[in-house]
Design a protein with these regions (language model features):
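Active-site phosphate/pyrophosphate-binding segments
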Residues: 13-20, 35-38, 44-47, 166-211
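Cofactor-/ligand-binding subdomain signature composed of acidic, glycine-rich
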Residues: 1-34
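Compositionally biased, low-hydrophobicity segments enriched in charged and small polar residues
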Residues: 1-4, 134, 204-207
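Mixed-charge, polar/low-complexity N-terminal
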Residues: 2-3, 8, 30-32, 75-77, ...
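Helix-loop module immediately N-terminal to the HCX5R catalytic loop
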Residues: 26-39, 76-86
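Short, contiguous clusters of charged residues that form electrostatic/catalytic patches at enzyme active sites
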Residues: 26, 30, 105, 159, ...
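Glycine-rich phosphate-binding loops that contact phosphosugars or nucleotide phosphates
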Residues: 44-190
């Protein structure tokens, strides 16, 4: 396969994930900016954080949990299931429900359980039943616009969580570190884009070795 011949890419990459990858730095930056703009109560007094999500919607939660571990004073648990752990209850629990579509069954049951147990809740989604239920209960909903697959929205699922943790005082301000990361990502694109030939593209060379 000639990896410098872009004419056949659309036949293989039918959902245009190449464009999603190219847009990841901009997506992450947009998510951070949205996270600064969305409404958020001046909450405090949390003792634990639970982030619920399934599949692609949970990828950002895993990244946030790994990033937060050295600096967040609270335990952060990523929950991929129906309902909630038994210990997740009361206003000392911050429940963040993440669902790309807003209609994920497991995440909706987690929301309902959190409401019944008196947790404080932040919903992250593009809309759907999750947004409607959280708003009806009086909790903040942070929406974003992404028409693709959940696994291609990792910039949103991570960036919004990062902004929420920062604004709630659960993490030191990551703004400078994020800016450095975005710059590094964009610099890497200069050697990894599909239009960069194999001789100057380490990603294509690795792909060639795997084929």
């Amino acid at each position: 396969m000639n990896l410098d011949d872009l004419s056949h890419f659309s036949q293989i990459d039918t959902q245009d994930y190449l464009a999603e990858i190219d847009g990841l730095p901009d997506q992450l930056q947009r998510a951070w900016e949205l996270g600064q703009q969305h409404a958020l109560p001046g909450w405090s007094g949390f003792q634990r954080v639970v982030i619920t999500g399934m599949g692609g919607s949970a990828i950002g939660a895993d990244l946030l949990s790994a990033y937060a571990t050295p600096n967040c004073p609270l335990p952060v648990v990523v929950h991929r299931n129906y309902g909630l752990p038994a210990w997740a209850r009361g206003p000392e629990t911050l429940l963040i429900t993440s669902s790309h579509s807003g209609n994920t069954e497991e995440t909706l049951t987690a929301l309902q359980t959190g409401l019944e147990r008196g947790c404080r809740i932040l919903a992250l989604c593009t809309g759907g039943k999750l947004a409607a239920a959280a708003r009806q209960a009086g909790f903040p909903v942070w929406t974003f616009d992404h028409p693709g697959q959940p696994r291609a929205a990792v910039g949103y699922s991570f960036g919004l969580l990062l902004a929420a943790f920062s604004r709630l005082g659960l993490l030191p301000d990551p703004g400078a570190e994020l800016a450095n990361a975005l710059e590094a990502m964009r610099q890497l694109q200069g050697s990894l884009r599909a239009d960069i030939p194999v001789v100057r593209n380490p990603a294509k060379r690795l792909a060639g070795q795997l084929l």
